[in-house]
Regions:
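Short, conserved charged micro-motifs
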Residues: 97-106
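Short, flexible beta-strand-to-coil junctions
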Residues: 95-98, 130
């Protein structure tokens, strides 16, 4: 496993966390853009080989988001006070109707999600891995 950057103040700044609301040592993050993800990777706050349980590895989610930058990731940040300090990516969402190509690739990459909303209506697309 990659050694992650322990500068939690900088990590939280990238993620837009202004005040830490501790829920058992984690903080939910509802919107991680491709730019934020790139900055987290470039500053060693994300390990591209890491994954949330049965989710695709972060590198595959990152490649997907580079190709389709309107998607946003969601997940949580773990407190630097815990041994398992990290940012975990639990899934992605699209807040608009997907193109046929986006929909097809979303279904392929995230088919094993614990929760998936892939009816390509006005609500967009969503997946979550427990």
């Amino acid at each position: 496993m990659k050694v992650l950057n322990k500068d939690s103040k900088r990590r939280d700044e990238i993620l837009g966390i202004k005040e830490w609301v501790d829920m058992g040592g984690i903080m939910r993050i509802e919107c991680i853009t491709i730019d934020q993800m790139r900055e987290l990777i470039d500053n060693d706050f994300l390990d591209l080989e890491d994954k949330q349980n049965f989710a695709p590895r972060i590198k595959y989610i990152y490649e997907f988001m580079k190709k389709y930058p309107d998607f946003e990731a969601h997940g949580y940040a773990v407190s630097p006070n815990r041994d398992d300090y990290r940012v975990s990516i639990e899934g992605v969402r699209l807040k608009r109707k997907a193109t046929k190509e986006e929909y097809k690739e979303f279904r392929l990459l995230f088919e094993a999600a614990d929760e998936i909303s892939a009816v390509n209506g006005e609500a967009g697309l969503f997946c979550w891995f427990d």
